[in-house]
């Protein structure tokens, strides 16, 4: 192996320690002036008696220490498997520059778990729950037939199984790889039910594979009747035609944050996530009964997002700043609500208001203009066919004004017409 002479080498190491390294890499470690790694990795080299940094706490602290103690020296950083796969590699390259860092990977845990399970990994979705919340996992798993999950002591195989079963996702089986590549390696297939009470080593990888066919994709424009709704007031839902046009105006992208204010049944949030699974959604609904229906719909459509009972603008302080805001109901406080949303909206963001009355239209239009948004309005009048005996007629639906406000990339906008 030909090694470059960059002053920071990041070496991937397996669960079997030195046995996973070539002689050239072992020599590189032992000749370093400063050895950096987690306690477990440093313990693989008891013969190394020079300076060490134990990776604990924020990575920024580790970087500061490398700059202070390692400048002008040969620095080796030990990392699990492939340092570029949900590892420390990209962070160090970003902090020190590509010209200063060399990545020397080992077999990744993903490669090993797929080898042990005889599964390919080029067609899998990869998710890391290491140090992350499980919120949003349902829709990401739902969108894939095969999922590889990096876990942590909180997000264990058992916790993942309980989470998925709460969304009735029992069409998956799981392959668990523990201490892969090490002397204590253990692997096996499990049903999700079998995982619930299982105990697994802290070092593990979860492979989920869909083994039963279910409805995993919904076309744009889910029928209103598929959503649980409050009865007898079944009209309290953003109708399919209006929902689709509103989502088009929001122009959502993966990684965006959406606020759904006056969420009611959650139809807008749910359909947004179905077509943009990496969306992060925060919904608020003042009616507790509607929130019950919303949660039923979350389970049915396997969409996990934050939904709270409250009357906006109260409660919005707990939400991430949004890229887009949908307002389906304001409880008579639209002006104040729009002002707060404009303050929190990220540059270039959008606000879409569904207005059923001229008064709501006027308030939305004038307030957004006063806030320097570029404003446009669409009047949507639709009708659905309805059978009468052997004939068919159209039954008109209530007209809805779609008011769209767009903020410029520098936080302001031009007045609309």
Segments (PLM) and residue ranges:
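Class I S-adenosyl-L-methionine
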Residues: 1-104, 111, 278-281, 285-288, ...
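A contiguous loop/helix-start segment that scaffolds small-molecule binding in enzyme catalytic cores
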Residues: 2-10, 22-26, 74-75, 146-234, ...
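Active-site capping/gating segments
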Residues: 189-206, 360-362, 367-411
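Conserved SAM-binding loop
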Residues: 294-295
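S-adenosylmethionine
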Residues: 286-287, 291, 307-384
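Class I SAM-dependent methyltransferase SAM-binding "motif I" and its flanking Rossmann-like core
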Residues: 83-144, 313, 371-395, 401
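Conserved SAM-binding loop of SAM-dependent methyltransferases across substrates and taxa
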Residues: 265-277
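Conserved class I S-adenosyl-L-methionine
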Residues: 255-264
